[in-house]
């Protein structure tokens, strides 16, 4: 993977993978069917709203391959789906249209072109996909680690409201930690 090229893509030009093991759709499923399944089973509302509010996280790699004339998303189907519906709200399934918040112009600008690593083929990416989704990866912080981080950020001058937003906690919870 370290020698795979990295390219910029408009998410609307990427093809969601019908073979994505997260969802069960026919191999010839339309992109609309895949998006619907992603919304139904893969918490796209939450992810799209997080991206709409905060943008994409740097360092989260998307992996694509060129397959049958399409640029197929092998890793990052949830993120790409989220970006697609933020860029083109008409792609949002009817049942979810009211649930997606409108992104800022800055976020729209940032997600119009996203970086992806280009695998030479699907097979070459299999090992990476397996490691990413089945083996221990990023270890979640313990509650104590979160408290230490909040205290350090506060000591560095970060406002309580900002720390609370970063950690998805109430301001009161942060105040209790930094006392």
Where on the chain are the PLM-derived regions?
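Amphipathic, charge-rich alpha-helical segments that serve as recognition/docking helices
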Residues: 35, 97-178
């Amino acid at each position: 993977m370290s020698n795979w090229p990295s390219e910029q893509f408009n998410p609307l030009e990427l093809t969601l993978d019908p073979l994505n093991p997260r969802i069960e759709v026919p191999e010839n499923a339309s992109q609309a069917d895949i998006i619907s399944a992603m919304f139904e089973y893969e918490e796209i509302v939450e992810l799209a709203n997080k991206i709409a509010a905060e943008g994409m996280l740097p360092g989260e790699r998307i992996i694509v391959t060129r397959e049958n004339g399409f640029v197929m998303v092998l890793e990052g189907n949830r993120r790409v789906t989220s970006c697609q519906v933020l860029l083109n709200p008409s792609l949002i399934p009817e049942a979810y249209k009211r649930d997606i918040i409108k992104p800022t112009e800055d976020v729209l600008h940032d997600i119009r072109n996203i970086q992806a690593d280009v695998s030479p083929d699907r097979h070459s990416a299999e090992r990476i996909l397996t490691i990413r989704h089945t083996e221990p990866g990023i270890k979640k912080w313990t509650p104590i680690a979160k408290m230490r981080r909040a205290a350090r950020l506060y000591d560095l001058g970060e406002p309580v409201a900002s720390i609370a937003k970063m950690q998805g906690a109430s301001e009161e919870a942060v105040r209790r930690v930094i006392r």
